[in-house]
Amino acid sequence: MVKTLYLMRHGQTVFNLKGKIQGASDSPLTALGVQQANAAQQYFKTKNIHFDYLYSSPQQRARDTLENTVPNQQYWCVKDLKEWGFGLFEGESIELLRAIKQPKYLYGDAVVPFEGESRSEVEQRVNRALYEMMDTTDGETILAVSHGSTIGLFVRNILGYDRGSKFEIGNCNIVKFEYDGEEF
């Protein structure tokens, strides 16, 4: 059976608006972020898309997005869907991180010396979570709400993009994958 995964980034947050790094820290959705989640809800209704299983990063911004997109439905929080841990850079300006990273990396391992996660750690946990999710559910249509960097790493990995290539996903944007039981 082919399954469908809708992978969605959380709505806009206060930190997104202010250009700050979130990572493992959290920031509430803005009014626009709530509107984005409501627009996603309308999109799924218009397309008559119903979900058999719902998953979210445990971070509040992702959970709030899911709860506004698919209200009053049971969902599971999956720890490995959380955002890339940026260590001491969390809460700081994105410009600070851009200043220290090497040009050939998106973030690469630039944050590791500052108590952050390595790229491979994030890739492994996100891939593990999404494959396990698809392998262990008997449903055909799944929605998972996560974060920009984690979704970006997954998409680049699945599509075979070069490690230095850039893939950005906007707030509440959705990517759709088909899963055949072995690969996306």
Residues covered by each model-derived region:
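Phosphate-handling substructures
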Residues: T69-R125
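Active-site-proximal alpha-helix that buttresses catalytic centers in soluble enzyme cores
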Residues: K3, M8-Q73, E117
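Generic beta-sheet signal
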Residues: L5, E140-G148
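Active-site signature of alpha/beta-hydrolase-fold catalytic machinery across serine-
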Residues: N68, L153-N157
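Glycine-rich phosphate-binding loop signature in dinucleotide/nucleotide-binding domains
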Residues: T46-H50, M133-E140
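Short active-site segment of divalent metal-dependent hydrolases/proteases
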Residues: T13, T150-I151
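Domain-level recognition of soluble alpha/beta enzyme cores
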Residues: Y161-F184
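Short beta-strand scaffold positions
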Residues: S56-S57, Q124, V145-S146
